[in-house]
UniProtKB/Swiss-Prot annotation:
Domain MATH: 68-195
PANTHER family cross-referenced by the UniProt entry: UBIQUITIN CARBOXYL-TERMINAL HYDROLASE, UBIQUITIN CARBOXYL-TERMINAL HYDROLASE 7
Keyword Ubl conjugation belongs to the record: yes
Region (Interaction with TSPYL5): 1-208
Tissue: Expressed in neural progenitor cells (at protein level). Widely expressed. Overexpressed in prostate cancer.
Extent of Low complexity compositional bias: 1-10
Protein name, as recorded: Ubiquitin carboxyl-terminal hydrolase 7
Chain residue ranges for the region called Interaction with p53/TP53, MDM2 and EBNA1: 53-208
Family recorded in the similarity comment: Belongs to the peptidase C19 family.
Disease affiliated with this protein: Hao-Fountain syndrome: An autosomal dominant neurodevelopmental disorder characterized by global developmental delay, varying degrees of intellectual disability, autism spectrum disorder, poor or absent speech, and mild facial dysmorphism. Most patients develop seizures. Additional variable features include hypotonia, hypogonadism in males, and ocular anomalies.
Disulfide pairings: none
Gene: USP7
Residues bearing the modification N6-acetyllysine: 869, 1084, 1096
Region (Necessary for nuclear localization): 70-205
Amino acid sequence: MNHQQQQQQQKAGEQQLSEPEDMEMEAGDTDDPPRITQNPVINGNVALSDGHNTAEEDMEDDTSWRSEATFQFTVERFSRLSESVLSPPCFVRNLPWKIMVMPRFYPDRPHQKSVGFFLQCNAESDSTSWSCHAQAVLKIINYRDDEKSFSRRISHLFFHKENDWGFSNFMAWSEVTDPEKGFIDDDKVTFEVFVQADAPHGVAWDSKKHTGYVGLKNQGATCYMNSLLQTLFFTNQLRKAVYMMPTEGDDSSKSVPLALQRVFYELQHSDKPVGTKKLTKSFGWETLDSFMQHDVQELCRVLLDNVENKMKGTCVEGTIPKLFRGKMVSYIQCKEVDYRSDRREDYYDIQLSIKGKKNIFESFVDYVAVEQLDGDNKYDAGEHGLQEAEKGVKFLTLPPVLHLQLMRFMYDPQTDQNIKINDRFEFPEQLPLDEFLQKTDPKDPANYILHAVLVHSGDNHGGHYVVYLNPKGDGKWCKFDDDVVSRCTKEEAIEHNYGGHDDDLSVRHCTNAYMLVYIRESKLSEVLQAVTDHDIPQQLVERLQEEKRIEAQKRKERQEAHLYMQVQIVAEDQFCGHQGNDMYDEEKVKYTVFKVLKNSSLAEFVQSLSQTMGFPQDQIRLWPMQARSNGTKRPAMLDNEADGNKTMIELSDNENPWTIFLETVDPELAASGATLPKFDKDHDVMLFLKMYDPKTRSLNYCGHIYTPISCKIRDLLPVMCDRAGFIQDTSLILYEEVKPNLTERIQDYDVSLDKALDELMDGDIIVFQKDDPENDNSELPTAKEYFRDLYHRVDVIFCDKTIPNDPGFVVTLSNRMNYFQVAKTVAQRLNTDPMLLQFFKSQGYRDGPGNPLRHNYEGTLRDLLQFFKPRQPKKLYYQQLKMKITDFENRRSFKCIWLNSQFREEEITLYPDKHGCVRDLLEECKKAVELGEKASGKLRLLEIVSYKIIGVHQEDELLECLSPATSRTFRIEEIPLDQVDIDKENEMLVTVAHFHKEVFGTFGIPFLLRIHQGEHFREVMKRIQSLLDIQEKEFEKFKFAIVMMGRHQYINEDEYEVNLKDFEPQPGNMSHPRPWLGLDHFNKAPKRSRYTYLEKAIKIHN
């Protein structure tokens, strides 16, 4: 408790339990501090449950790992105490615990002194990640009579910010120092603490050492899965069967049996907590699935179903049913006639209601209790009609392993959400169930031993899951709290998880069991049979160990990654076929990648490269790809001799990965011992050549050349003709490819290279083409225009707006295209008319269609795509129309419901004139739907809110007045023949809607019904039954009411005659809706939540 909370502290003098509080240690001591007597731990050697011998012996040798202890702290010269004092540490769960005592004053009585008494944990630790939950009793010893000692309880999660907890005003100072009270003797006061701590988190807790078992890492909101997996793991017979499943040919990332084998194997052999990500990945879960908190019963059921199906046809087929399947019979027995219905069913778990039940026996009694079917709930006995009957279930067999689901999470209709029931519910360690079996076996009584208690702390919206397990069935319990496993007492495992309110603060109200696992006593040794390494197939062991070896290798590589760099080698054959700027496309090129030590020398790398590529060192030359200031990337000179001793990271200028163009001798000449020509870095230059063909609008790579810088352009023409396969002396046009969107023509062929090319450097590119007049007829007659077109070229994904998650198709377009050019290109791909397409921008903030484009849009494609990031896929949406876009743009989209002649609703979208009226909308609807054969052919538009018709719109009403809203729906229907002409004096169309008990809970399809003044209501009922096509037996359950202003009055069906005034608004209240006829009956249609994604059933996909 902080200092503000201390202001609300209760009077210690009244000895009421004040709120526990935390307090920071107050620094400093008095000049003459009170002397402290260190008392030994009273019960340091507390009894601890057994486990594996090694763990037990270790714990006996070192009591610091114990779970509880009582220790005392005596303060001498107590009356002179002026500062806080600390006791020596007592180690529990290997954490230091100290008693802290100090003088305090009551906040509301500043002149009245009190004793502050706190328990401190691990205060001197520098770590900020540790935590430990503990319960403690703080006591001041009465030396005359221990029964009069004053004590208070605390329960707290200790962590670095709240490392002490207790009471600022534990007792009044005057009471402690009053010799008559018995708390002080010779100016000495003894303080005592009994602390009981859970295993800590965030510290070096060795679960394997202390218990013999390891935990599971918490993967997020699937933490309940850890409890289930531990429960299944300790069902040893199941574990054995899982090991025996053949998985040799299974995909390691998709096989559920293999993933389960892996988890079980690691739980059995690992010394550290085991991960479950590979298991959930094998389920085929998406991110949302993995973090949705499902019922543990649901996960248990689908997981065991999946494993059971994979076991079919193997040596362990039938293991799941053998362990978990029981049989029951559901029966219905008629009372008055000789009719009985029996249905035998298999079950794999039992769901027990706990609301209002004291213990598990009462829940079983309730489960098999006989239900009376009478009154409105009579049983339909076929030819015998509706009959009074008794309904119930009886257990035929109970399985060896009994899973009991305690229904702590239930739906609350008042709040329309699930709630958690934290009521106390008791369950025994031994559970006799013979009395619930239809037939018992004296040789094999249905006596069960508690094996697992799955516990939830928190409310319906979240919390924490743990499981208490009795691994060997011998009453020695362990607590599995995700990655931490610790010994615990039988009381902690059982009684502390009953739930309900308790004065004992060690039991938290919201912590209780939600699932129990019992094992039949006669099957205990079989179900919990020892699982040894001999039970695990050798091939499985080898596969899992190989996985571990590979993971360790990858982990080592990650740890050493900072020592290495990647060198990407690109060969000259990757330049061939490239149709863009520079020498290759970085996203398409295939590199040969080398992992190189950053501190290795260039000479060492060249030697390794030579051996790997199969070329002697004099047949290769390295040209690092260097980024130029103009945005291009070209090869640059690397001097092997001068730079041979330099390190790779130094030469790469910390570039990682480092890309190098590897020049080699022609493979055909390499065998003859040919070497690369000499290259004088001071006087020579390396140039790349490309040939452009206007007829095919393509580039052809023509290799590279070494030439002196003083060489004239004209001297290169013969080489170009030769490389391109042209006749010598063919007239050529030359360009320098400077950068994207800048290609300059070389005009003067009689000047040297350094004057002809802009800033001559190694890696410059010359593009040449034939000087042919016929090229003028080409779409892109020159290389300059080709590169300009290339610069504006863009790949656009077009997705159909009407198809959810449509992957679409890619079209290569020019940024300079206008709307019609784009539409024409896309229409050719879709084999349709450009005028029958409508396009939509992509929303910038999320992936989806935005506003539609008008057909007279004046911008270019570049304008449409300007908000996309450079490397982001460019996307536009389209929809195909049934009318030309010029006509379509003058219409509006109108979503509504169509009620067909079979009284079924379907959603349709109509496109009436945006300035039209309801009549135009109805005419459009006639074109889109199929009308009934024996109907009027006339349509009407209804407005529906909350499943009630609130109005019929007139045909001359403008559509502009009908604005859509989420709370209302428009419905179009054909007017029945009997409703075309209404005698307004004696007839009326009344709204009919469905509800169940509460008139605000309407549902189903409302409709209009014609009623006549004075007609008997039975006639109205006949028309309703005919319209809804309901069987007589079902229709008998309907009640009818007139609903006005939210209140309903039930109709006496035998006496009531229709009075039209009952369905007219009250005088003076014309603004209120008309009364309507309500049909009160049960809603058999499933209610759908607005949050349907949260109700998605859990599913294992593989």
